[in-house]
Amino acid sequence: MNALILYGTETGNAEACATTISQVLADTVDTKVHDLADMTPRAMLDSGADLIVFATATYGEGEFAGGGAAFFETLRETKPDLSGLRFAVFGLGDSYYTTFNQAGATAATILASLGGTQVGDTARHDTSSGDDPEETAEEWAREILTALATPAVS
């Protein structure tokens, strides 16, 4: 199995979390980490990855950080068939704002609406909690490994 881990960041936290997620998954899964600013939906689909993990921070008024805005706008416009695509979302945000973790929720909604199948729950790291985002990412990645090992119930 192989996973493509994509991140959108302004301050570097999502990138650090993507690296942590990659390290946890690498015990079982071949991983590659890329900035969403350097990725297109077509390249994502052509990667052949069995799992796509998004680590995305909410920025400004609920927008995607970094290259996430352009990436997800292209997904909305082109509407590729994502059936057969498994994805997971690690969101970062600050509950001080009313748009807390909106980018992560929006990512999951877009991917599912195009036919993707979500693995595990969308993570919602809260900067205001004082919890280390990389520790939260590590715990969440272990949950994703467990979800991947559990057969789907139909």
From Swiss-Prot:
Keywords: Electron transport, Flavoprotein, FMN, Transport
Pfam family, any one: Flavodoxin_1
Gene Ontology annotations for the cellular component aspect, listed alphabetically: cytosol
Signal peptide: none
SUPFAM superfamilies documented for this protein: Flavoproteins (SSF52218)
UniProt KW Methyltransferase keyword: no
Start and end residues of each Flavodoxin-like domain: 3-145
Annotated function: Involved in the degradation of cineol (eucalyptol). The FMN protein, cindoxin, shuttles electrons between the FAD-containing cindoxin reductase (CinB) and 1,8-cineole 2-endo-monooxygenase (CinA).
Family: Belongs to the flavodoxin family.
Name listed for the protein in its UniProt record: Cindoxin
Species of provenance: Citrobacter braakii
UniProt gene name: cinC
